[in-house]
């Protein structure tokens, strides 16, 4: 049997080390959720602000984090905690808009947190993680063993989800219009268009920030589908916001 090439052996050991390090970091991340005094909430709020006005600055900070902590993903759960608080507050507004009782509000809150945010995020992060590592990763001696961390893919989702949350759970509250008029559909559906396109754009920035990925522009391709769906929704008279309100009110709660 021929001996295994040295570079292949090195790559394999690097990947094993990377997986062990990732598991250890995820354990520490979950453990820190119970230690709120160790969380940097001020920095989490700074990130949320710049995700809305200059998201590239947020990902430049991820570069610095990689250099100092040897991982791309966050090791501080403060961002997730603050995002959960935002979800709770915005859900109160939706409870008033939908005229929910306390139990209905509680069921709605659980759905928004564990399905809309975390559940959908787990699916999207896993798909992006697999796709990027399988098709976009550059295999060179310099980048040997470097992969997209699953935790980083989930962080990218959380980053993209926050502006979407502001648009659909806060701004949209002022434009919940049930009238069967074109202007009603135009305002509501336009908010959905902006939210989804911005979600895709911030996701693109997150993966394009990784130096070992190529052709990350493909992540922007779903924007075309979103625009087509937006035009079709206006043409056929579908009020997206109204449909989701009815879904939450009659199916979730």
Segments from the language model and where they lie:
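Hydrophobic alpha-helical transmembrane segments and adjacent short intramembrane/lumenal linkers
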Residues: 129-240
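Transmembrane helix-loop boundary segments of multi-pass membrane transporters
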Residues: 108-109, 183-189, 248-253
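Juxtamembrane boundary at the C-terminal end of a transmembrane helix
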Residues: 235-253
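Charge-rich, low-complexity amphipathic helices
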Residues: 77, 81-84, 218-219, 225-229, ...
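Membrane-helix and juxtamembrane interface regions of eukaryotic multi-pass membrane proteins
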Residues: 1-145, 178
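Generic structural signal of hydrophobic/aromatic residues within well-ordered alpha-helices
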Residues: 29-30, 93, 127, 170, ...
């Amino acid at each position: 049997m021929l001996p295994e090439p040295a570079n292949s052996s090195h790559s394999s050991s690097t990947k094993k080390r990377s997986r062990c390090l990732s598991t250890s970091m995820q354990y520490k991340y979950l453990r820190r959720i119970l230690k709120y005094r160790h969380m940097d909430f001020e920095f989490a709020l700074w990130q949320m602000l710049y995700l809305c006005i200059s998201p590239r600055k947020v990902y430049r900070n991820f570069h610095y984090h990689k250099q100092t902590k040897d991982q791309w993903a966050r090791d501080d759960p403060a961002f997730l905690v603050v995002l959960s608080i935002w979800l709770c507050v915005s859900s109160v507004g939706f409870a008033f808009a939908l005229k929910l009782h306390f139990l209905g509000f509680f069921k709605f809150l659980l759905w928004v947190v564990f399905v809309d945010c975390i559940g959908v995020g787990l699916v999207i992060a896993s798909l992006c993680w697999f796709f990027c590592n399988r098709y976009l990763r550059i295999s060179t001696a310099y980048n040997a063993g470097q992969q997209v961390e699953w935790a980083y893919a989930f962080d990218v989702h959380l980053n993209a989800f926050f502006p979407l949350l502001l648009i659909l759970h806060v701004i949209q509250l002022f434009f919940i219009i049930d009238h069967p008029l074109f202007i009603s559909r135009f305002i509501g559906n336009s908010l959905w268009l902006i939210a989804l396109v911005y979600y895709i754009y911030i996701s693109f920035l997150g993966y394009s920030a990784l130096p070992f990925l190529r052709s990350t522009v493909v992540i922007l391709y779903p924007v075309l589908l979103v625009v087509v769906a937006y035009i079709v929704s206006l043409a056929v008279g579908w009020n997206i916001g109204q449909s989701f309100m009815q879904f939450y009110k009659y199916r979730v709660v």
